[in-house]
Amino acid sequence: MPAEIDIDEADVLVLSQELQKTSKLTFEINKSLKKIAATSNQSSQLFTPILARNNVLTTLQRNIESTLNSVASVKDLANEASKYEIILQKGINQVGLKQYTQVVHKLDDMLEDIQSGQANREENSEFHGILTHLEQLIKRSEAQLRVYFISILNSIKPFDPQINITKKMPFPYYEDQQLGALSWILDYFHGNSEGSIIQDILVGERSKLILKCMAFLEPFAKEISTAKNAPYEKGSSGMNSYTEALLGFIANEKSLVDDLYSQYTESKPHVLSQILSPLISAYAKLFGANLKIVRSNLENFGFFSFELVESINDVKKSLRGKELQNYNLLQDCTQEVRQVTQSLFRDAIDRIIKKANSISTIPSNNGVTEATVDTMSRLRKFSEYKNGCLGAMDNITRENWLPSNYKEKEYTLQNEALNWEDHNVLLSCFISDCIDTLAVNLERKAQIALMPNQEPDVANPNSSKNKHKQRIGFFILMNLTLVEQIVEKSELNLMLAGEGHSRLERLKKRYISYMVSDWRDLTANLMDSVFIDSSGKKSKDKEQIKEKFRKFNEGFEDLVSKTKQYKLSDPSLKVTLKSEIISLVMPMYERFYSRYKDSFKNPRKHIKYTPDELTTVLNQLVR
C-alpha cells in the first residue's frame, strides 16, 4: 500500500515552487528595467546639446530683433538731431533767438528722454554715440547763447560820463529789443546749472563797463585844487562829477536789473549788489584819498569836506533799501568826514577868539574890525555849503563847538527848549554862537584896552565897573551892523531862521543898553527925595532941586555931545537907539519938571529945557 501524502507539506511545496517562479520573473523584470534606464540615460545625453542649441538660437533671434529695433531708434534720433543741428549751425542772427532756444530745448528734451530710459536697458552702448553728440551739441549751442548775450551787453561801449553830464544827456541804455533778448537768455538759463554763470557774466560785464567809464573821471577826482596854497573854490573838484556819474550809473543799473529780472524779483537785490559793489569800493577808495588831502591842508581845503558830506549822503541815499556787501565802506567814509567837519565847526569858534584877541586897540573911529570881516567871510563860506553843513550835523551837539571858556550869561541862548534833532536848528545855533562869540570877545578886548587895570565884566549892561559902556556899545553895534548887512545879503539870512534872528536882535538890544546906560544914570539923578515937615506936609529942599536940575542940564549936554560922535549907519539901530533914549529920559524928566517947575521965582535960571524942547533935541540927536 502506497505511503500516505501529507496535505500541508503539499501546500508548502507548491508555494515554494511558485515563489521560485516569481523570483525568477522579478529578476528578469529588474534586468529589463536596467536596460531601459541605460537607454533613457543615453537618450538624455543625446537631446541636451540639441535643446541648449535651440535655446541659444532663440536668444540670438531675440537679440537680433532688439538690435534691429535699437538701430532703427538710433537712426530716428540721429536723423532728428541732425535736422536740429543744421538749424543751430545757421546761428542766432539767422535763425532768430526765440527759435534757436526752442531748438536747444528740444535737443535737451531728447537727451533727457535717452538718459531717463537708460535705467530700463541692460545694454546701452548703441546709444552712447548719440548721447555724447547731443551733450556736446547742447553745450556748443549754450556757449553761443552766452556769446550772443555778451555781444548785446557790449553793444554799449565805454564813454566819458562828463560829456553826458555837461550836455545833460542820459547815459546810454539798451533798446527794448536788446532788453528782450537779454531777458530771454536769462530766462533760458534760469534754474539750470548754467544760471549762475550767465548771471556772473551780466554782473562782470556791467561792472567792467562802468569802471571803464568812471576811469575817465578818476584822474580829475584825485585832485582838489591845482594850486596847493589857494583856497578851494566851491564845485571845482572833479569828485563832484565823479559822484554825479556814480549816481547816474546806480540809477541805470537799478533800471536794468528791474527790466531783466521782472519775473525773478527775489534775485534783484543780490544782482544789483554784485554789480555795484566794485563801484562802491572804487568810490570809497577815492573818497578816502580826497579826505586825506583835506586833512593835510584844512585852511585851504577844509570847506571841501562839506561837498564830500553831500557826496557820501547822496550816494547812501541812492542805495537806500538795497543790499550791499560793502556798505560798511560808506559808513566808514561818513564817520571819517564827520570828524573833519566837526573840527571845522570847533575851529571856526576858536578862529573868532584868536582874531579878536589879536586886536590891540579899538579903532579910532570905533568901526569894524578885521576880526568881524574875517568872521563874516568865514560864515559866508559856511553858507555856501549849506546842504553839506546840514548833512554834517548828524550826531553833533552844541558842545562840539562851544569854546572852553564858555559862559552861558554871555550868550543870547539861555535855557531855551529847542528841537536839537532838527539839523536846521543846530546850524542856526552854530551861526548865532559864532556871532555871540565875536561880540563877547570884541567887548572883552575893548574893556581890556580902555580899562587895563581891571578884570573885564562882559555882557553886563548894568556893570558898575564898566565906565565906557557907551563907547563899547557903539563899537560893538558898528560891528554888528556889518554882521547884519552880510546876513541879509547871503544865505545866512535863511540859515539863521526865526530863532537866529531873534538872538541877533537880543544881542543888538544888549549893546543898545550899553549906549543908553549913561542916559539911564542921568535920569536916575531926577529921582527926588521927599521930606516931611513938622506940619506933616511934603516939602522939598529947593537947593537940592536946583542941584538936580543943574546936574541934569550938564549931564544932558555932555551926553548929547558924546552921542553925536557915535554916528550909526543902520537906520533901524538909529530908530531903536532914539526910542530907547526918549523912553528913558522923557517920562522921568516930565514928571520931575511938572512937579518942580513952579518952585522957582525965575524958572529959566535953573530949568534949561521944557519937555518939548528936550524932545526936540533928542529927536535931532540920532539921525
UniProtKB/Swiss-Prot annotation:
Any GO CC annotation of this UniProt entry: prospore membrane
Keywords: Cytoplasmic vesicle, Exocytosis, Protein transport, Transport
Taxonomy, superkingdom: Eukaryota
GO MF, any single term: small GTPase binding
SS bond list: none
Localization terms from the record: Cytoplasmic vesicle, Secretory vesicle; Bud; Bud neck
GO BP term (any one): exocyst localization
InterPro entries xref list: Cullin_repeat-like_dom_sf (IPR016159), Exo70 (IPR004140), Exo70_C (IPR046364)
Pfam families reported for this sequence: Exo70_C, Exo70_N
Main localization (coarse): cytoplasm
Coiled coil: none
Keyword Protein transport tagged: yes
Extra remark: Present with 4280 molecules/cell in log phase SD medium.
Quaternary structure note: The exocyst complex is composed of SEC3, SEC5, SEC6, SEC8, SEC10, SEC15, EXO70 and EXO84. Interacts with RHO3.
Family: Belongs to the EXO70 family.
Function: Involved in the secretory pathway as part of the exocyst complex which tethers secretory vesicles to the sites of exocytosis. Plays a role in the assembly of the exocyst.
Protein known as: Exocyst complex component EXO70
Organism of origin: Saccharomyces cerevisiae (strain ATCC 204508 / S288c)
The gene coding this protein: EXO70
